[in-house]
From Swiss-Prot:
NCBIfam families: S6. Gene3D superfamilies: 3.30.70.60. The gene is rpsF. GO terms for cellular component: cytoplasm; ribonucleoprotein complex; ribosome. The keyword Transmembrane does not apply. GO terms for biological process: translation. This is Small ribosomal subunit protein bS6. One of its GO terms (molecular function) is structural constituent of ribosome. Binds together with bS18 to 16S ribosomal RNA. InterPro entries: Ribosomal_bS6, Ribosomal_bS6_sf, Ribosomal_S6_plastid/chlpt, Transl_elong_EF1B/ribsomal_bS6. Belongs to the bacterial ribosomal protein bS6 family. Disulfide bonds: none annotated. Signal peptide: none annotated. It comes from Deinococcus deserti (strain DSM 17065 / CIP 109153 / LMG 22923 / VCD115).
């Protein structure tokens, strides 16, 4: 199983209940693809580098997941269908570079 970073930006105007609903949906979508969540960083509302739609802020969620195969397209396509999801980025973690010892 490979390790991936899943970064999401949600609508900044969501209530706490709506954010929890989105988190539950994301975790269900990840389980449907065969991925397991190993870490979740909830960064909350942050200012965006540029305007996305009409929003200058976004609600950031950063997941560390483990999945087999090549789940990037499956995960991203299922999450982009949500109305409150503004951006999705799935990146495969690379192992640490091995350096030669002198």
């Amino acid at each position: 199983m490979n390790q991936y970073d899943l970064n999401l930006i949600l609508n900044p105007n969501l209530s706490a209940e709506q954010v929890q609903i989105e988190k539950d949906y994301i975790e269900t979508a990840l389980k449907n693809v065969g991925a397991e969540v190993s870490n979740l960083d909830d960064l909350g509302n942050r200012r965006l580098a540029y305007q996305v739609g009409k929003d200058r802020e976004g609600y950031y969620l950063m997941y560390t997941i483990k999945a087999g195969g090549n789940p990037e397209k499956d995960i991203a396509s299922s999450l982009r269908l949500r109305d409150h999801v503004r951006r999705v980025l799935v990146v495969k973690d690379r192992p640490e570079w091995k350096t030669k010892k002198a």
